[in-house]
Amino acid sequence: MTIIVDIIGREVLDSRGNPTVEVEVHLENGALGRALVPSGASTGAHEAVELRDGGTRYQGKGVKKAIAAINGEILEELGGRDARNQIGIDQAMIALDGTPNKARLGANALLGVSLAVAKAAAESLSLPLYRYIGGTQAHILPTPMMNIINGGVHADNPIDFQEFMIIPVGASTLKEAIRYGAEIFHTLKKRLKDAGYNTNVGDEGGFAPQFKSAEQAIDFIMESIIACGYKPGEQIALGLDCAATEFYKNGSYFYEGEGKYRDVGEQVDYLAQLIKTYPIITIEDGMAEDDWEGWKLLTDSIGKKCQLVGDDLFVTNSARLRDGIKMGAANSILIKVNQIGTLSETLDAVETAHKAGYRAIISHRSGETEDSFIADLAVATNCGQIKTGSLARSDRLAKYNQLIRIEEMLGLQACYAGNWYC
């Protein structure tokens, strides 16, 4: 039977050495699901609340309160329920929390349980996780968006944009796409070192050189692509995560590295110029999370030429996404499971996007773990795109390696998205 008999929460550490939540769900038939919860650095103001303890322990970042909720109230509520009823379980936890943003029990508590329940149910049915969540139609291997230069709050450098990504749109398989990315990553490392820049990596495994402008970062990446023998725009496209909320000040965008302010119109014009100059096919959070007018202006300007992704704008929240769809803001949504706090709400956001013709991109967080859940989620939803960092750090590679395994499991049914979904 797939009845929940025990739920165990524990405090472990994430990739930044900060506490996070791990949950085990045990079923009556002996099946076990274990999940770890990620954490963001550039968090949107409208995200579900990650419950931290405060005080001096772990500099206030402990998660004992969330663990107590899991081992107490949540276990009491969910014990005896069928793990296959994902929606019912998630709704029960949301009702138990009783707040609009999961602030009482913590989104980190609810998410850990939600994901572990899905894993336990899949295990009990002897199904791969992607197949359990996505059914028989799950077969699209996502095009990876590989963050090989880090800036913003993900790195200790003056670059204002948070991520500079390579996207292997011309590869024929997921495994080949990962090889393309690894070769460019190592070539970039050598070129940076030869130019006198340090090659330490940021939170997501990308390099964090002391560049002062986006153009400088992009030029180094372009040179590395060409040095590897690949064709920019044809085999390798580029993507940006501006994380513009982080440098939005009093109605303008302040570029600290350049010492320059850009008003809303100038910000739109700047991004439009970048996609003319470089083979950039996707821009995430090009405007601040509450600059709705700016988002509409940006979408009207370049939305037919470029994927415009709302991360902080939508925070994996179907209600905010519907507002954006009505307004014509952005044309895609970034999906982060911990922004909303349950698997069923995450899947609802993906479905809402797809029904409206918006793309959905499954994403990691800057504070990650060895858990590879999002790799299975990307295939389960046939989203066709995934962001899971650079080609360094085991917390990032865990997801790439799981995608390689899934591609092998799917065999002839496997279909690499390439540029179809970008």
Curated annotation (Swiss-Prot):
Keyword Secreted: yes
Pfam families: Enolase_C, Enolase_N
Keywords annotated in UniProt: Cytoplasm, Glycolysis, Lyase, Magnesium, Metal-binding, Secreted
Gene Ontology biological-process entries: glycolytic process
Cofactor(s) essential for the protein: Mg(2+)
Protein localization: Cytoplasm; Secreted; Cell surface
EC number, UniProt record: 4.2.1.11
HAMAP family found in the cross-reference section: Enolase
UniProt-recorded name of the protein: Enolase
